[in-house]
Amino acid sequence: MTAEEFVKAVKAEKEVSLELYFSKHHETLIGNLINDIIENGATRDNLHELINQVLNENCYSLLMALDGEASLGDTQISYKLFDEEENELTGSGEIESAAYEQFMQ
């Protein structure tokens, strides 16, 4: 797995979560809260965009922290992340670049 593939997997997981939150076929706590807010006048599209942006920023921040480019909590250190074949995914800046492309553009 490359750093770019790792970032794409994080994005895919975010998309699955977002779809689940807005699904009419699955009941989740977040989905119930979304439905309550919609019943009080917010639009589904506006909520979807808001939650999408929140998840994008959270995923981006976490990936930046894993790559040593931002703090995680109040600590900024470089982490080493390896795939199952012991290839290092961090340290080269590839996560930072791929994360920006996937979550911030």
Which residue ranges define each predicted feature?
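N-terminal low-complexity, intrinsically disordered segments
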Residues: M1-A42, D67-G68, L72-D74, K80-F82
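Short acidic DE-rich linear segments
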Residues: E4, K8, T90-Q105
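Amphipathic protein-protein interaction modules
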Residues: A42-E94
